[in-house]
């Protein structure tokens, strides 16, 4: 196994549910829309909780095998079925909690849970922006403690706290829309979302937006924070909240336009270069919607390519062998069947320097945009050969490209997104 680092978290943020920040913001805005006028900022807090609950399926790693957990993530908890049933269950639970005579204590626990969620967001941003630094999270913990010392004790134990004016139906509506919008946003990413579970394991992956895109999240977050400063009956509160929803939704629609533009560019390049192919898959690179990765299924091999909207040169394709001849029982092995399903068939195999087999989900591409070696693949898995009659053992590989740093990766990403100029190829 390889040491986990900031660059792995950067590359595999989808698997680790690092998109929670966007889902928290979206959930909070939805909660405000449903109940904000009646219960104020508590609607945002509970909306953020609703936006986080589906991703709690990551806890499956503690009681499932790695292979089963891979299939479980974005499964039943991300389904339309869960949105309906879960809304009634959590709505009933929230109503029951606030009807309890211990509602003040419950409110305190809820606030603590919200602080933990926000702390997770701070920790996420710290890992991305200043990996290895502990000061931001320490400052956050200090501010939470200061707030509790000055306001929390008096409010929750001084008799000034009141239960929110919401019934079971209103709570169920908040959770339903929080769950549903979470699922829909995930459908726009690459990983795949089983929205029809448990009736079907079909995965929806439109691949129009990166799992972490600040252009979607940051304006949304700013509008939400401004809205939270106004009283619940102030019209400006709703205005700012809807501004955030409108901006984020408009950007999401723009990513669909970008997707169609890049898809057309790839088709034209394949036709112009007289390349026969069966299908291709495109997806934006991390943190932006300008630089896109593409993988083409050309039959016996894959073709990798990157395209930036600022490129002045044609798309260049790099062939990568499928390597399926390295595997045995390709059509019957249950481990390989799960990986083919997970990757939508965009799977290749390589042999590592230590002799171990490695299979890669080609939809996520490589760090370099080509395929310089086994460690260059972003989404990769190690296989253990247990004998000719036994299924392959499975273990998700960890680590990033050797001798690299998150800062170097980001610089390379920014430079490539700026495009390849025609003069550079002359």
Identify the meaning behind each predicted range.
Residues 2-264, 268-284:
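N-terminal membrane-targeting hydrophobic helices
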Residues 276-279, 286-426:
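Extracytosolic and intramembrane catalytic regions of membrane-associated proteins
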